[in-house]
């Protein structure tokens, strides 16, 4: 019989230190082995020289780092990063399109309804990245017609500060957040700005109905805009419990911050964030090369390294303690589910007054 060794504080710390040491290896400009197709695409991209990336599903620092990593591997092709929340990015793109301006070459968004709209209007290019079949099956074929692909995933969970909430009283489910003991302690982003928060709200509305949010209001949550505002509110100690992706807070816990991550018994929300190449791109080769890079081994390793983000690829191990959607109860958000987001935003404003 095989015995499983228990995970102790010492062994967990050792794993984290080993992981950190691995991440400390400096990046190099060495290219991976390029296929003939990718090399041909790269040669064409070098003639274009740059691309502009509209992106919502990373913070600004991470998005800029991804752009630098791409240029290190593909010298001569620069990435101009335009980063904002999902709805702000899409508003800017919509203004570009109305003005006939081809400013964005690549769009990455946490809101799948953006891609459904663009696809319907024939504003996305058809492109299947070479790396598309290298991701876990769960993340393949976000669009069967190859107009957008999953390039990032988030597992939305509950986080709490141990100096604000005792472990015995900590929430175990989304329903627990309705308990009066969390009044004045909760922090969330806003579905009118953040695609991730929108997906979370759509999921819980579908599961529990809008009465869930009406009850949640009674606990006086603090509502930011971006889901990243939850990090700010919890890091400052202003609030003690919130919902966000799990990676950032697991990393902070390993670094000594008073955080614990709860994978809700009624389901962590799995959100796929997509990427598409704009049909009117003036840098179509650079755009395709970059879209392929986002799901490369190098790019996915960079995300795990910097943010402890979930990996889309089986050949890129997750950070210490990372959970996959197969290991915990989940609520999975489909493209069709996100069509409900427009009406939900209005209900959210009516309920929470913002």
Question: PLM features: residue spans?
Answer:
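Short, polar/charged alpha-helical segment
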Residues: 35-52, 56-78, 158, 252
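N-terminal export leaders
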Residues: 8-13, 17
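A ligand-binding cleft/hinge motif common to bilobed small-molecule-binding domains
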Residues: 113-117, 240-258, 307
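Extracellular/periplasmic bilobal clamshell ligand-binding domains
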Residues: 317-354
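Extracytoplasmic ligand-binding site segments that recognize negatively charged/polar headgroups
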Residues: 54-67, 79-97, 102-238
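Periplasmic-binding protein-like
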Residues: 153-155, 181-192, 214-217, 223-224, 255-281, 294-318, ...
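A bilobed periplasmic-binding-protein/Venus flytrap-type ligand-binding module shared by bacterial periplasmic
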Residues: 159-164, 201-202, 271-286, 302-303
């Amino acid at each position: 019989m095989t015995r499983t060794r228990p995970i102790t504080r010492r062994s967990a710390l050792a794993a984290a230190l080993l992981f950190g040491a691995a991440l400390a290896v400096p990046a190099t400009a060495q290219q991976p082995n390029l296929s003939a197709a990718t090399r041909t695409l790269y040669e064409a991209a070098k003639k274009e020289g740059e691309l502009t990336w509209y992106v919502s599903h990373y913070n600004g620092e991470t998005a800029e780092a991804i752009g630098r990593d791409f240029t290190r591997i593909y010298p001569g092709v620069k990435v101009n990063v335009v980063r904002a929340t999902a709805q702000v990015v899409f508003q800017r793109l919509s203004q570009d399109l109305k003005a006939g301006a081809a400013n964005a070459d690549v769009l990455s968004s946490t809101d799948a309804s953006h891609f459904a709209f663009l696809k319907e209007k024939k504003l996305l290019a058809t492109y299947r990245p070479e790396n598309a079949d290298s991701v876990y099956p769960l993340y393949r074929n976000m669009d069967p017609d190859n107009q957008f692909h999953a390039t990032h995933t988030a597992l939305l969970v509950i986080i709490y500060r141990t100096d604000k909430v005792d472990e015995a009283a900590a929430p175990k489910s989304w329903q627990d957040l309705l308990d009066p003991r969390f009044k004045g302690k909760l922090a969330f982003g806003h579905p009118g700005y953040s695609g991730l928060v929108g997906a979370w709200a759509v999921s819980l509305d579908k599961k529990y109905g809008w009465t869930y949010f009406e009850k949640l209001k009674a606990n006086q949550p603090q509502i930011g805009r971006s889901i990243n505002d939850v990090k700010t509110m919890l890091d400052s100690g202003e609030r003690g419990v919130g919902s966000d992706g799990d990676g950032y807070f697991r990393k902070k816990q390993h670094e000594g911050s008073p955080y614990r991550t709860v994978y809700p018994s009624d389901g962590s929300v799995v959100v796929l964030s997509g990427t598409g190449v704009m049909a009117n791109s003036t840098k179509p080769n650079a755009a395709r090369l970059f879209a392929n890079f986002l799901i490369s081994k190098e790019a996915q390793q960079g995300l795990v390294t910097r943010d402890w983000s979930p990996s889309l690829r089986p050949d890129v191990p997750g950070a210490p303690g990372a959970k996959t959607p197969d290991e915990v109860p989940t609520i999975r958000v489909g493209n069709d589910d996100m069509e409900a987001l427009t009406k939900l935003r209005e209900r959210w404003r009516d309920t929470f007054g913002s």
